[in-house]
Amino acid sequence: MKYALSNEGRIEATPKANGICQCCESYLIAKCGTQKIWHWAHKGKRNCDHWWENETQWHRDWKDYFPKEWQEVVHLSDDGEKHIADVKTPNGLVVEFQHSAISLKEKLSRETFYKDMIWVVDGRRLERDFQRFNESFRTSDWRHWGPFVRKNRIPSRSLPKSWQSSKKLVFFDWGFVKSEYWIKDWHSHLICLLPETDELGWLQLIAIEREQFTEIVSNSSNLDSNSLFW
């Protein structure tokens, strides 16, 4: 994790630093090597939050789009269950950044636990996922819905099935890639998968600029597809 508690408040890992886990209040070890990003870890292989995944630079870069106070916030349910949200805004919206594979059971558990949440998925993890997604636009056209938003529909085979059952908005980050089927500068957009298919069972997508995405997230709660059309 990025932050630990100390006498100075929340601090990032530095060599020989001491910290306390904000979730379980146990001592943390500052991991400051050369192979991985500097982070805090529990002793041994223990981790108090089983939803937590090892962070990559991709995680850190996304978190840093938002204020430090919003990053790694402990979310407590009515029954006392606790988990660390990647980002939680003052309006109560949780953003989870997912790089590694995730089971359907865990995905649904997180959506039920956080309630008001969205996903940002690292689409670059498997190269074939982007190739399949990119190819689907060979014969499709984006429709304009305002200055920053475009809408489209593609067959279900175009995106990983593991995310098509989500009840929340899923934003795919394909990185700053180039595509012969996308118009100029669209490689900087996020592609949002809506929870609802159209009347023919096709997936519905929204393309939104990164800056506009962070602005909407920062000012919204209970974000849904209607929030993206203004």
Language model regions located:
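Short hydrophobic alpha-helical runs that function as membrane-insertion/retention elements
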Residues: 116-121
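Non-catalytic C-terminal interaction segments of nucleic acid-processing enzymes
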Residues: 2-9, 13-16, 124-230
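Nuclease-adjacent, charged terminal/linker segments that flank catalytic cores
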Residues: 1-71, 77, 214, 219-230
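Short, conserved loop/helix-junction motifs that constitute active-site signature segments
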Residues: 111-114
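Active-site metal-binding core of divalent-cation-utilizing nuclease and nuclease-like domains
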Residues: 11-13, 25-31, 61-109, 128-137, ...
